[in-house]
């Protein structure tokens, strides 16, 4: 009789369930921190696989983009139609330090502003900030009737549209080029630029619903940890390390 492996004995029993491993046991939570430009810095939490071997969790987290409602960052429902994108630039322990990556309007807000009997005017500029960020800013505006106007419609002529678009482009270029990215972000929240555009164009044609509807980050400078820490209020140029007093070893004359 030939001696060999019995194939029937090696087979396992049918119907046995495989051991199920919870995938969350291989993951860990990190806290997302918004820049100090916003009132509420605690954005939320995110998951990532734990560091194993050559794969580091911090490498998987860097560059991750999250989208947050501006109302949650400012604690006010007046900003609920704005969406802010934040990009993870560095990992400090269990905290993810983010930077501004873009801003956009919700679709329902844009649709609610489009109405009859008025002209829609759009403009966009690509400008470099004072700290070497290249961003593209999109603005939107609508015409409105004058105070003593009887006519129902408030349509603007092509010459008016071109003149208004030029004024908007000039204001956006000046505001962006003379500001850092953090300073420009702080101007978006109280809508300072929108009011300036309304006042500058009232002699050409009265406007309403003037908004910066979108900000897109095209290019960013080389990563600087010091500027990121200053943006989060966790570092200062005045902080310096203290000199530690040293000691001298006692030399023995005889051994």
UniProtKB/Swiss-Prot annotation:
Any idea which GO molecular function terms this record carries?
structural constituent of ribosome
Q: Taxonomically, which superkingdom? A: Eukaryota
Show the GO cellular component annotation of the record.
cytosolic small ribosomal subunit; fungal biofilm matrix
Choose any GO biological process term that the UniProt entry carries and state it: translation
Location comes to: Cytoplasm
| List of residues that carry N-acetylalanine | 2
Alphabetical UniProt keywords: Acetylation, Cytoplasm, Ribonucleoprotein, Ribosomal protein
**Where this protein primarily resides, as one coarse class?**
cytoplasm
Which PROSITE patterns does the entry link to? RIBOSOMAL_S3AE
Pfam families reported in the protein's UniProt record: Ribosomal_S3Ae
PANTHER family attached to this UniProt entry? 40S RIBOSOMAL PROTEIN S3A
Similarity annotation: Belongs to the eukaryotic ribosomal protein eS1 family.
The record's annotation in HAMAP family points to: Ribosomal_eS1_euk
Describe the subunit structure. Answer: Component of the small ribosomal subunit. Mature ribosomes consist of a small (40S) and a large (60S) subunit. The 40S subunit contains about 33 different proteins and 1 molecule of RNA (18S). The 60S subunit contains about 49 different proteins and 3 molecules of RNA (25S, 5.8S and 5S).
Name listed for the protein in its UniProt record: Small ribosomal subunit protein eS1
Q: What organism is listed for this UniProt entry?
A: Candida glabrata (strain ATCC 2001 / BCRC 20586 / JCM 3761 / NBRC 0622 / NRRL Y-65 / CBS 138)
Q: What gene does this protein come from? A: RPS1
């Amino acid at each position: 009789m030939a001696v060999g492996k019995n194939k029937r004995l090696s087979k396992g029993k049918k119907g046995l369930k495989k051991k199920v491993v919870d995938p969350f046991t291989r993951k860990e939570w990190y806290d997302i921190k918004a820049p100090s430009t916003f009132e509420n810095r605690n954005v939320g939490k995110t998951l990532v696989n734990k560091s194993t071997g050559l794969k580091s969790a911090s490498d998987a987290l860097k560059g991750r983009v999250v989208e947050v409602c501006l109302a949650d960052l400012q604690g006010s429902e007046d900003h609920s139609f704005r969406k802010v994108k934040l990009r993870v630039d560095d990992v400090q322990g269990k905290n993810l330090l983010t930077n501004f990556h873009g801003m956009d309007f919700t679709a329902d807000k844009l649709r609610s502003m489009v109405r009859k009997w008025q002209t829609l005017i759009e403009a966009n500029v690509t400008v470099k900030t004072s700290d070497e960020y290249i961003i593209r800013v999109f603005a939107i505006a609508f015409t409105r009737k004058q105070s003593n106007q009887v006519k129902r419609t408030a349509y603007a002529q092509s010459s008016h549209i071109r003149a208004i678009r030029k004024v908007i482009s000039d204001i956006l270029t000046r505001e962006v080029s003379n500001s850092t990215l953090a300073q420009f972000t702080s101007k978006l929240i109280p809508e300072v630029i929108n009011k300036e555009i309304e006042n500058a164009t009232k002699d050409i044609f009265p406007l309403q619903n003037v908004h910066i509807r979108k900000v897109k980050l095209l290019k960013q400078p080389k990563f600087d940890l010091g500027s990121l820490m200053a943006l989060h209020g966790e570092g200062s140029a005045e902080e310096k390390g203290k000199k530690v007093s040293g000691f001298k070893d006692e030399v023995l004359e005889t051994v």
